[in-house]
């Protein structure tokens, strides 16, 4: 996303706010440009939209998958642990989205034509985003503490997985800023794939295992497709802003190839599982028409709402995958 500034404005890198040249504060909206006070309902709606809730499939489906694997392998499913795990992962995911909003604005990357205009349009102010992000990270830590109290999982194992995910969500754009040096795809692939599935599985059964990481692969690829479609859409504006993403490195043609790979390899995996293990794993194949629709949209370079539509596919694919695992006969799937 390109850094487009109106004449007479500059970006305050440290504070992440826009200030008029000559404004002595340079860290607050000019008094005459401040928005009028809004109702608490309108502000609550603004906070919800700032979280980008359409992307939450990337965190909810891994939690559901990890819990389903725990149920099928060990016969355990504690609703309290499922709820606590879901809230913890959602809180970290939402906070990570806010960190991304804050740093993209601070670095002058977001602009009036950006998909996320929470700060550009002054829907919220930077300090609002910071406070909300701190609240969500705190909520996630409280949930993690509750999970330790309720689960038999060792503290060091729970802390390793949880704070690994928390660090990934922050460092994606904060601190090191993996997103800006073409490593964001790797962070998302790990955090919202194997790590989240392992977290949900481990808190249920009280121990770690390798096989949930294998079962997480189809979901991880589908989740990465969301990010890659977003980065491909923003390729030109990101290049102008001076940041580097994987989409920029490989170019439009190979970005199209990669998107199709991320989109369709999960179906190949499900076909193999349905053929050799259980027919219930063919359920995710019901979403293939949606995948072909997304492929056509990407090929025609109609990127508007493509990440949101890819997230919808990710949600449906994940739910059918979870149902397929639950419905599979005992012993038909490896390790289940």
UniProtKB/Swiss-Prot annotation:
Catalytic activity: menadiol + (2E,6E,10E)-geranylgeranyl diphosphate = menaquinol-4 + diphosphate; all-trans-decaprenyl diphosphate + 4-hydroxybenzoate = 4-hydroxy-3-(all-trans-decaprenyl)benzoate + diphosphate
Keyword Protein transport: no
InterPro entries hit by this protein: UbiA_prenyltransferase, UbiA_sf, UBIAD1
Chief location bin: endoplasmic reticulum
UniProt membrane topology term: Multi-pass membrane protein
Transmembrane found in the keyword field: yes
UniProt cross-references to Gene3D superfamilies, sorted A to Z: UbiA prenyltransferase
Role summary: Prenyltransferase that mediates the formation of menaquinone-4 (MK-4) and coenzyme Q10. MK-4 is a vitamin K2 isoform required for endothelial cell development. Mediates the conversion of phylloquinone (PK) into MK-4, probably by cleaving the side chain of phylloquinone (PK) to release 2-methyl-1,4-naphthoquinone (menadione; K3) and then prenylating it with geranylgeranyl pyrophosphate (GGPP) to form MK-4.
Enzyme Commission (EC) number: 2.5.1.-, 2.5.1.39
Protein name: UbiA prenyltransferase domain-containing protein 1
GO molecular function: antioxidant activity; prenyltransferase activity
Subcellular location: Endoplasmic reticulum membrane; Golgi apparatus membrane; Mitochondrion membrane
Keywords, in A-Z order: Acetylation, Endoplasmic reticulum, Golgi apparatus, Membrane, Menaquinone biosynthesis, Mitochondrion, Prenyltransferase, Transferase, Transmembrane, Transmembrane helix, Ubiquinone biosynthesis
Family: Belongs to the UbiA prenyltransferase family.
A Pfam family hit: UbiA
Subunit structure as annotated in this protein's UniProt entry: Interacts with HMGCR and SOAT1.
Native source organism of the sequence: Mus musculus (Mouse)
GO cellular component, one term: Golgi membrane
Known pathway: Quinol/quinone metabolism; menaquinone biosynthesis; Cofactor biosynthesis; ubiquinone biosynthesis
Domain of life from the UniProt record: Eukaryota
Bilayer-spanning residue ranges: 81-101, 132-152, 158-178, 186-206, 207-227, 243-265, 275-295, 313-333
Residues recorded as bearing N-acetylalanine in the entry: 2
């Amino acid at each position: 996303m390109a850094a487009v500034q109106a004449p007479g404005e500059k970006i305050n890198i440290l504070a992440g706010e826009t200030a008029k040249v000559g404004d002595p504060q340079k860290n607050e909206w000019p008094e005459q440009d401040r928005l009028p006070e809004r109702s608490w309902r309108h502000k609550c709606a603004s906070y919800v939209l700032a979280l980008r809730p359409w992307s939450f499939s990337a965190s909810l489906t891994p939690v559901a998958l990890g819990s389903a694997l725990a149920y099928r392998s060990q016969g355990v499913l504690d609703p309290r642990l499922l709820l606590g795990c879901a809230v913890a992962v959602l809180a970290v995911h939402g906070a990570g989205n806010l960190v991304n909003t804050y740093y993209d604005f601070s670095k002058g990357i977001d602009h009036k034509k950006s998909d996320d205009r929470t700060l550009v349009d002054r829907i919220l102010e930077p300090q609002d985003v910071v406070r909300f992000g701190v609240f969500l990270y705190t909520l996630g830590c409280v949930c993690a503490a509750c999970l330790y109290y309720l689960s038999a999982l060792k503290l060091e194992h729970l802390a390793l997985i949880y704070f690994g995910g928390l660090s990934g969500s922050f460092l994606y754009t904060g601190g090191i800023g993996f997103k800006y040096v073409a490593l964001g795809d790797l962070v998302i692939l790990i955090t919202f794939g194997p790590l989240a599935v392992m977290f949900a599985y481990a808190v249920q059964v009280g121990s770690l295992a390798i096989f949930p990481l294998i079962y997480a692969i189809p979901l991880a690829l589908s989740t990465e497709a969301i990010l890659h479609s977003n980065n491909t859409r923003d390729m030109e504006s990101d290049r102008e802003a001076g940041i580097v993403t994987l989409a920029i490195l490989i170019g439009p043609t190979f970005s199209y190839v990669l998107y199709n790979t991320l989109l369709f390899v999960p179906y190949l995996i499900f076909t193999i599982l349905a053929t050799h293990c259980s027919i219930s794993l063919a359920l995710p194949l019901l979403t293939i028409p949606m995948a072909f629709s997304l492929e056509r949209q990407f090929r025609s370079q109609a990127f508007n709402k493509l990440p949101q539509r890819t997230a919808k596919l990710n949600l449906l694919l994940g739910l059918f995958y979870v149902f397929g695992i639950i419905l599979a006969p005992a012993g038909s799937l490896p390790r289940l």
